[in-house]
């Protein structure tokens, strides 16, 4: 549909990660952490729901403080599980970037708030865009689809990149639903 191989990942530290892939059609997979880089190495863009860098100090990175100022909620990186997720995210980012993949950090809840979409609305949008899943979607699956939407919007130039010295987060421009 878009002529690009794109993906969205809801990264997990305790179970296989939910991965939404656009390559011809849209499909959702569950992938063990050790297989993620290999499975995603041929993608052009991968958006990830996980911190991809660690803060230099404190609970939030500089660009996250800007997102918090806008009224969105994020989990602090001084929580042990978030720190572990950030370490995995950083490893995945480095592995994929070595393969030439563009890796984006995003936050699905914030994405859906900006676009005014509920989880159900997001799934309906992805069905219109080519997703034909046969099973009930978990919250992780919906987050992976939301990340995939960010990859699509990135290719279309319909995103804002909130940048800082400690990394960046990619968010949709308001009203940018394809």
Features from the language model and the residues they span:
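Phosphate- and other anionic-substrate recognition elements at nucleic-acid/protein interfaces
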Residues: 1-178
């Amino acid at each position: 549909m878009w002529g690009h191989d794109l993906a969205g990942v809801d990264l997990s530290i305790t179970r296989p990660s939910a991965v939404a892939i656009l390559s011809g059609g849209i499909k959702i997979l569950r992938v063990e952490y050790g297989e993620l880089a290999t499975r995603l190495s041929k993608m052009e863009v991968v958006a990830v729901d996980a911190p991809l860098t660690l803060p230099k100090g404190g609970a939030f990175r500089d660009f996250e403080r800007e997102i918090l100022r806008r009224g969105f909620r994020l989990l602090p990186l001084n929580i042990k599980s978030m720190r572990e997720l950030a370490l995995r995210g950083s490893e995945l980012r480095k592995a994929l970037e070595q393969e030439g993949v563009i890796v984006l950090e995003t936050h699905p809840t914030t994405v859906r708030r900006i676009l005014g979409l509920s989880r159900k609305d997001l799934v309906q949008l992805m069905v219109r865009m080519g997703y034909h899943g046969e099973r009930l979607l978990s919250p992780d699956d919906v987050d992976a689809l939301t990340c995939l939407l960010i990859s699509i919007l990135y290719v279309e130039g319909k995103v804002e990149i909130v940048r800082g010295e400690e990394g960046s987060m990619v968010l949709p421009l308001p009203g940018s639903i394809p």
